[in-house]
């Protein structure tokens, strides 16, 4: 299920809501950038914290106009939404230190790869509403494909809050938690596949005499146009492909070469291998954390 696009205005659902990012790495920054760009939440209501890197917090403050604070300076209890964005290996200690400060009404959004809602629920022990989130790096410009999986204590109102907040970064899809690995293979890692494709488009154009930047711009606009055709027409990609493929024409020649080189199968294998690796990472975390706290899968 995908959320509807929203206009750039302050939304009533965010009235007086305060959001804190626990962790200040690249994933947190991408989400902060998307949310700030959307201009739906007052910047002063967005906070970010990390263990001790004040230089990084100052950098984010200056870049995005939000508040940065060390854990002992941030009033966790006053927040409405807590976004867990630390490294997964640090989750055990972070949850342990936050446990006594988190309030039952607070919505927890977790972008911790491989860590389930059940694990977080059991770690906090007070029927905490938890939503597992998988954005991609396009969140930085408000164009992410973001998946959410709901924990068992998430109410309909909190689901709407999560969708509205994450909708600031792009499109939001509600999936089952056991579908997170394949979503990661398609959308989490997906931007890299297209960047890889663009490398070859740019290089080939340049070798044929095009300016490097021009070749890049042409390729990027072509990818953007194809994506918009899929989204706006609702047509099956095969139909759109057939519509521009004349017998013995240029597109047919290009597609034949692509198929001969294993293009379609390569794409399929890339997604499958990324999904497999996502599952392996989850299992590695399980081996480490399960004896301590419970359920990760």
UniProtKB/Swiss-Prot annotation:
This protein's pathway reads: Amino-acid biosynthesis; L-proline biosynthesis; L-proline from L-glutamate 5-semialdehyde: step 1/1
Q: What's the protein name?
A: Pyrroline-5-carboxylate reductase 1
Q: Which SUPFAM superfamilies match?
A: 6-phosphogluconate dehydrogenase C-terminal domain-like (SSF48179), NAD(P)-binding Rossmann-fold domains (SSF51735)
Q: Name one GO cellular component term.
A: cytoplasm
Sorted UniProt keywords:
Amino-acid biosynthesis, Cytoplasm, NADP, Oxidoreductase, Proline biosynthesis
| Annotated function | Catalyzes the reduction of 1-pyrroline-5-carboxylate (PCA) to L-proline.
Major localization class = cytoplasm
């Amino acid at each position: 299920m995908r959320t509807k696009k929203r206009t750039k205005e302050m939304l009533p659902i965010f009235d007086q809501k305060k959001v804190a990012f626990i962790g200040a790495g690249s994933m947190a920054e991408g989400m902060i950038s998307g949310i700030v760009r959307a201009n739906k939440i007052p910047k002063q209501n967005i906070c970010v914290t990390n263990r001790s890197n004040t230089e990084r917090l100052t950098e984010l403050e200056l870049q995005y106009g939000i508040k940065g604070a060390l854990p002992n300076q941030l009033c966790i209890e006053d927040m409405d939404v807590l976004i867990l964005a630390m490294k997964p290996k640090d989750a055990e200690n972070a949850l342990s230190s936050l446990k006594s400060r988190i309030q039952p009404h607070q919505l927890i959004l977790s972008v911790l790869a491989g860590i389930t809602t059940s694990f977080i629920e059991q770690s906090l022990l007070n029927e905490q509403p938890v939503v597992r989130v998988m954005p991609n790096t396009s969140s930085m410009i408000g164009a992410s494909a973001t998946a959410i999986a709901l924990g068992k204590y998430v109410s309909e109102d909190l689901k709407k809050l999560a969708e509205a907040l994450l909708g600031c970064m792009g499109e939001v899809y509600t999936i089952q938690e056991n579908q997170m690995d394949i979503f990661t293979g398609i959308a989490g890692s997906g931007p890299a596949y297209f960047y890889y494709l663009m490398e070859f488009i740019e290089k080939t154009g340049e070798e044929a005499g095009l300016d490097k930047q021009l070749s890049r711009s042409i390729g990027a606009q072509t990818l953007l146009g194809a994506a918009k055709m899929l989204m706006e027409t609702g047509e099956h990609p095969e139909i759109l492909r057939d519509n521009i493929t004349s017998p013995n024409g240029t597109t047919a020649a290009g597609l034949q070469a692509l198929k001969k080189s294993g293009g379609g199968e390569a794409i399929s294998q890339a997604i499958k291998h990324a999904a497999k690796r996502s599952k392996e990472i989850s299992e590695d975390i399980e081996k480490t954390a399960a004896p301590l706290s419970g359920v990760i899968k």
